[in-house]
Regions:
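Acidic/aromatic-lined carbohydrate-recognition and catalytic surfaces
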Residues: 11-238
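Short, Lys/Arg-enriched N-terminal segments with co-localized hydrophobic residues
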Residues: 1-9
Length: 238
């Protein structure tokens, strides 16, 4: 009886499933930019109360949102270049110079992978020192996963994106402290880049989510059922 009473007290409402990557964008894949805010406005105008998303994590080699390099990190592809231009981290010419794919109905993940990280590296070159205090706070708040994730991605990049079980350095494979200390120093620039990318991701996502919630719309998230074998989570907890 109590359960029935609780159900009758719930307000009937509806929403729409719209993955971030499906939003229109001049950058090859949907982002947290203008189209996301416009979709939130559309939901509000249509009387919808929920925006359902697919997982927001960084996709692995199969580009599936359900196979992610991290259960905690965000997908770098969703960082909007136009917002970075507005912050002074990129120029419009830099954002327009890269090829993002020619078919607006299909995501060319190959081109995005080739070009997105180079663009974000430009943003990091301008913003790392400028944002240092905020980055330090971000690192402290996310200390349980961010250091391992940033080093994991730097190592994957260094070892040609091979699964961590195939890395030629056995110490790095086994997450041994001495090896990790060596690689953290050796790959410092890349570790900083992957740290800064997460800083940018969550800054843009937090702003978008605040806007969505301000319209009276709730976000229904999603996560993979299991962590992926080739992920920072499994690597860091062997």
């Amino acid at each position: 009886m109590r359960c029935r009473e609780r159900w009758t007290e719930m307000e009937r409402s509806s929403g729409i499933l719209m993955p971030i990557f499906s939003l229109p964008s001049p950058y090859g894949v949907g982002t947290f930019g203008a189209a996301a805010y416009e979709f939130a406005d559309f939901l509000h105008a249509a009387g919808q109360r929920y925006w359902q998303l697919l997982p927001l994590g960084p996709t692995g080699c199969g580009d599936s949102p359900y196979q992610s390099f991290s259960a905690h990190a965000g997908n770098p592809y969703f960082i909007d270049p136009d917002l970075l231009i507005r912050e002074g981290l990129l120029t419009a010419e830099e954002a327009a110079a890269s090829a993002w794919g020619e078919n607006p109905r299909h995501v060319d993940y190959g081109k995005i992978y080739e070009n997105r990280f180079a663009l974000l590296a430009r943003a990091k070159a301008r913003g790392w020192e400028r944002d240092r205090a905020a980055i330090s706070d971000f690192e402290t708040e996310n200390g349980g996963w961010l250091p391992d994730y940033a080093l994991f991605m730097a190592l994957k990049q260094h070892f040609d994106m091979k699964p961590w079980t195939q890395w030629p350095d056995e110490g790095a494979q086994r997450h041994e402290a001495l090896s990790l200390s060596h690689w953290r120093a050796e790959l410092r620039e890349d570790v900083e880049l992957f740290t800064y990318i997460q800083f940018l991701f969550f800054r843009q996502w937090d702003a978008l989510k605040k806007y969505i919630n301000g319209l009276g719309i709730s976000v229904i998230g999603d996560i993979p059922v299991y962590v992926a074998m080739d992920s920072a989570d499994v690597w860091a907890e062997p």
